[in-house]
C-alpha cells in the first residue's frame, strides 16, 4: 500500500492526455502529478503542467508550470508560472510569474510578475513588478512597479510607473513618464508629467494662478495645477 501511494505521488510526463471531467481522464486520479505535451479537456481537466498546447471546453487547471498555448471556454487556472499565449472567455489566473500574451473576456489575475501583453474586458490585476502593455475595459490594478503602457478607464499603480498611463482616472505613487487623463494623481512626479483637467501631485507639485489681458483687452484668469515639467 505504501508503494502504491508513493508511485501516485511521483510526477510523470506523458505526450498527451484527454479528459472529459476530472478524474475521468486518461491520467485518472494521478492527473495532478502528470505533465503533458498536449492536453484536451472536454469540460474540465487537471494537470501537473503543460509544455505545448492545451484546449479546454470550460476549465483548464494546472498545478505546475505551463508553456506554449492555452485556450479555455471559461477559465485557465495555473498554480505555477505561465509562458506563452493564454486565452479564455472569462478568467485567467496565474500564481507564479507570467510572460507572453494573456487575453480574457473579464479578468486577468497575476499573483506575481507579469510581462508582455495583458488584455481583459474588465480587469487586470498583478501582485509583482510588471511590464509591457496592459489594456482593460474597466480597470488596471497593479500593486508594484510597472514599465510600459497602461490603458483603461481607471489605472491604479501602487509602485512606480516608468512609461505611460492613459485613462479617465490615473493614479500612481511615483511617476517616471506621462499620465494622460481627466484626473491624474501621483505622490511624486519629479521625473514625469501629468496632462489632464485635474492633476493632483503631492510632492513638488506646481500650483499657480495667472492673470493677464489678451489682445482684445479681456481679462484672462488661469489656474495651473500639476507638475513643473508640464508648464516649463
Question: What positions do the PLM features span?
Answer:
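Surface-exposed, glycine- and small/polar-enriched segments that build interaction surfaces at terminal
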Residues: 10-232
